[in-house]
Amino acid sequence: MWFDFLRRGKKEEKKKETRYILTIDGGGMRGIVPAYILKKINEELKERGLSRPLYSYFDLVAGTSTGTLIALGLTAPIDNLGLKKEEGDDWEVTEIVEKGRFRKTTEIVEKGKIERLGDPESLLGLYTENGKKIFIPDDSKGLWKIVGKMSKMLGDKYDTVPLEMFLDEVFGDTLLSEARVPTMAVSTNVSGCTSYIFRSWDSHGFLLREAARATSAAPTYFAPAVFIDRETDEKLTLIDGGMIANNPILAAYIEARKLYPDADEYKILSLSTASPPCILHPEEYVTNIEWLSHLTSAYSSANMNITLEGVESIKGVEVCRVWEPVLEKKIKLDDTSKEAIASLLEASQKIWDQDKERVYLFLDELTASPVGDRLKLKDESKTKESLPALEEPGRDGLYLPS
């Protein structure tokens, strides 16, 4: 008995703390690919009998450009969103609280509920049904078409009004701070060409649609987004986050280290937009103009590759990168044609078929993890019932109903 008392009193070893991150690349209409992958992941969770909302498994969700649209669609409250709400009841979360020094008992405390937000399976519709609302094709002909092309050479290719109307329709006036898990969007500040990160946990009063507008302001396609920071009164001129981090994985890791400094591991699910590998053929480029036409894509591809390699080399970081070179030709970020959409959907299925086993392994660990301590829950805490002492619940002591 005395030996058993000493054994019980021994300090328990600290359990390994693992944080899970979802990152989504930029790429305009190629956002069809990560939206499709998330749809398949959600279907897989249901096949496993898990109906907990997908977003609630992650400790941080990050996006660049079109990836931000998907990230916010996953994590923001549905009340004002132009997205289909996921069906099903909210999920109750309880905490096991131990009481008593010698005769231990436990109480089950209702911590709140995990809300149903945007249905991951409806994210595809943002592109397949709304692409032409944002990238309005030029239907003019003859001389007027030539005049239109010449005018666009001197300015941005698209008017920002349709984009802003679409974002207002989807997000309304919902605040970025209302995201239910930490969510971030990468944009580029033209002052110094530095990154500007929109953070739900330090939102400076920004709206969801403002973050989405800034991070998707692709140069030559849309005019920069100009905002006044509501906390500092600083004037910000922001452009597409893809200029500095089309794959937001490094920015997400940096922010995760700040949010969760005591974590032992960071496991990242990184979703691509299926941009094809960049292959240069210098022997074919005779003039500087020919070189220049390939340099932008070469720089972007090289930047993404070295960023991914750098994060993968960090101790304590594991990356599940969902990308395969399946697109037969490059699809422009504003290509809303039926052929382009069909090609992207076909590529999405091929990528899923090739990478799903690795994703399943990631999901095995993800779904076994405890509820994150930064997940915002509905309703207030209250004691449900008292029970005999139980085993240590793990990080945060939070449980889902069986």
Where are these regions (language model features)?
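Conserved catalytic cores and adjacent C-terminal regulatory segments
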Residues: 2-402
